[in-house]
């Protein structure tokens, strides 16, 4: 999404839409705030303006999608909100040290902390809502027409998926963990599938699984 981040300039490329971000804005914080605001109020539409020192382009963010367009060309390039957040958060986390120097007069450590806090405010509620929707949809599909032992098996799975969701809501993991889980199409189903093959409590396996995933990433 972002590249060549240096001296208050960065290139932007998403879904074939190309633009430039300049020192006139703080693109990461502006986009973060727009995503936070449109989650808190799903009727809201926020437009983030990017000034290339001459021409302008825009990100229009809603609770469902993100559109990119230019001042002189109103034709939009559209993405789902979820896909935009996945790429945006992964991208910013990867290059957070570069973004911390976007405005040289600011303390890089303080800027990193601010960015991480804003990314958390985006990803955590989005992840929890995604898991809640996943669980709701799963129940609506799985519980239809079940009888006898099938109901018991379904109730068993439901109990542990609900426990996994409760753990995600209450246990503090690092930002990278929340981003990693948000990138899964069905986070609860993914976690439940791993838990089924392990002899451990739901909490233990969730934590152990996350640590193992992190170790594999470091080895790569």
Predicted regions and their residues:
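Aromatic-residue detector
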Residues: 2, 55-59, 115-127, 131-134, ...
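Acidic interaction surfaces
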Residues: 22, 26-29, 74, 136-220
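Generic solvent-exposed, charged/amphipathic alpha-helical segments
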Residues: 32-36, 89, 93, 161, ...
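Long protein-protein interaction modules used by eukaryotic assembly/scaffold proteins
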Residues: 13, 58-140
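A generic secondary-structure boundary signal that marks alpha-helix termini
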Residues: 40-41, 97, 173
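Residues in intrinsically disordered, low-complexity segments of regulatory proteins
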Residues: 8, 56, 98-101, 137, ...
